[in-house]
Amino acid sequence: MASDYSFDIVSEVNLPEVKNAVNQALKEISQRYDFKGSNVEIELNEKEKEIRITADDEYRLKRAVDVLEAKLVKRQVSLKFLDYGKIEPALGGTVKQTIKLKSGIPREKAKEIIDTIKQTKLKVQTQILDDKLRVSGKKKDDLQAVIKLLKEKEFGLVLQFTNYR
């Protein structure tokens, strides 16, 4: 039996689900009456982890964002992963907006999570590994208590627990 148990805390967006949501949003926009005759584009750049939306005017852009958000929620992708850029004028009298997909746990948030875990006085160790955290301890019960605590507290991130050992 292992002497130490551990798990990782990550915050990663599910890119295939985002891609599906973008495709569904494009399909709905092409069929909706209020978008008839307008030019609305939604592009997912998986490498840069961003979504670019281009529309004829600001109103249609906001409606396209609403449709995309609805499709993301339906595909169980949290809107906390989205970081909205400013609406900017684009070529040909159109407007565009870039939405970045946040991935990973920033250092400040990681330190905040570690402080929260330390305040519980549970016998667990927490390490920062790049953009994730590893929590290890001798008892599974302590690790389960940490997971329960982190699920109850709001950090402004979507936390996922993986790599149980």
Curated annotation (Swiss-Prot):
- The entry's protein name is Nucleotide-binding protein CHY_1197
Q: Give the superkingdom in one word.
A: Bacteria
Question: Is the keyword Zinc assigned to this protein?
Answer: no
Annotated GO MF terms: nucleotide binding
Q: Give the record's keywords alphabetically.
A: Nucleotide-binding
Gene Ontology cellular component list: cytosol
Q: What does this protein do?
A: Nucleotide-binding protein.
Protein family according to the UniProt entry:
Belongs to the YajQ family.
Mind telling me which NCBIfam families this protein's record contains? PRK05412.1
